[in-house]
């Protein structure tokens, strides 16, 4: 914690702890012994002679690596080119990590998009080796197909896809290999054109999670449409859940500004709702994905505070039963 809170330094933070093997292309010679180690933060200070620090919040491990030449100059240029995207923050200690929250209330625009999805045949061709003997198990609510070892279903209204495949005698692989192989599967199947990032690994059942992003912010929701779950057995995928619909055309005339609580007021609201900072695992500013009442081809992306407690992500208004839309109306 002392290293994280040291002054005059810059920090890059990942959404979740990332195995070093997945970052190996950034190292000159990363030894295989370190492949399974994970980090959640990269820290470097203003002294050019000091190393770069790689940190794991959960285990409190700190790794050091040699600093690349002219690192600060490159980062200074990046900052100067995007000054308007930054806000002054204050550090807060939560259950799992130190979080940075804005000192003042912040304003972000609500987005409205037209959405599209590939045809069902696109996923059928990708997920089934042989389509000649498929059984059509469809209903009014779902498109559904199966063969002797796998089953696919797609919700007709939302486009949520679920897939299961039975695989026996899979090779036992280290965690970082499962994560890496799952990424290749997602890249092949998902036609999301905006960024998506690794968002966690469940060691108990080999589930790998990814989350979609827009404008640098993660997508959540009461139904978590931003989350992709993939389960690996060896190097093969056995389960998959994700949203086939993707944002396509922004309707800029429907956008509107939403003002969110400052960090201090956010924590005060949670505390008043019965949640102490030591119960809070993570806090993120993100978009709440909801389908428009006009049409399921229209999606509202509303900026909100999202909080992870007991392993579950929910919006602030879900945790405390109130509203967080306008900071001025929050009572703080």
Regions found by a protein language model. Name each.
Residues 1-174:
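Preferential activation on post-signal-peptide N-terminal prodomains/segments
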Residues 235-259:
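Short helix-loop boundary/capping segments
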Residues 298-332:
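Hydrophobic, glycine-enriched assembly/anchoring segments
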Residues 122-152, 156, 161, 192-236, ...:
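Exposed beta-strand-loop-beta-strand "reactive/processing" segments of non-cytosolic proteins
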Residues 61, 169-170, 246, 314, ...:
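Short, surface-exposed beta-strand-loop junctions and turns on beta-sheet-rich folds
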Residues 168-205, 216, 251-294:
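Short, non-transmembrane alpha-helical segments in secretory-pathway proteins
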Residues 70-72, 118-119, 216, 262, ...:
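Helix N-terminus capping/helix-initiation residues
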């Amino acid at each position: 914690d002392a290293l994280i809170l040291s002054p005059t330094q810059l920090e890059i933070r990942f959404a979740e702890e990332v195995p070093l093997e997945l970052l190996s292309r950034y190292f000159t010679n990363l030894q295989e012994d370190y492949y399974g180690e994970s980090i959640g933060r990269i820290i470097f200070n203003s002294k050019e002679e000091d190393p770069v620090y790689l940190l794991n919040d959960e285990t409190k491990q700190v790794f050091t690596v040699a600093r690349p030449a002219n690192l600060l100059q490159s980062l200074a240029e990046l900052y100067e080119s995007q000054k308007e995207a930054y806000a002054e923050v204050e550090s807060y200690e939560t259950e799992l990590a130190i979080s940075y929250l804005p000192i003042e209330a912040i304003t972000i625009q609500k987005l409205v998009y037209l959405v599209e999805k590939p045809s069902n045949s696109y996923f059928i061709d990708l997920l089934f080796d042989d389509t000649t003997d498929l059984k059509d198990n469809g209903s009014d609510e779902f498109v559904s197909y199966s063969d002797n070892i796998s089953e696919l279903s797609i919700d007709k209204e939302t486009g949520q896809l679920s897939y299961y495949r039975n695989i026996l005698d899979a090779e036992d692989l280290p965690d970082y290999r499962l994560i890496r192989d799952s990424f290749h599967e997602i890249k092949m199947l998902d036609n999301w054109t905006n960024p998506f990032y690794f968002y966690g690994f469940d060691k108990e059942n080999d589930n790998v999670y990814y989350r979609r992003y827009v404008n640098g912010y993660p997508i959540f929701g009461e139904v978590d449409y931003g989350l992709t779950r993939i389960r690996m057995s060896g190097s093969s995928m056995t389960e998959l859940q994700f949203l086939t619909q993707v944002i396509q055309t922004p309707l800029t005339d429907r956008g509107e500004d939403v003002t969110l609580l400052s960090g201090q007021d956010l924590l005060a609201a949670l505390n008043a709702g019965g949640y102490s900072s030591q119960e809070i695992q993570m806090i993120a500013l993100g978009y709440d994905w909801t389908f428009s009442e006009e049409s399921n081809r229209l999606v509202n992306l509303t900026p909100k505070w999202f909080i992870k407690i007991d392993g579950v992500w929910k919006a602030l208004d879900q945790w405390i039963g109130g509203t967080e839309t306008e900071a001025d109306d929050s009572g703080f």
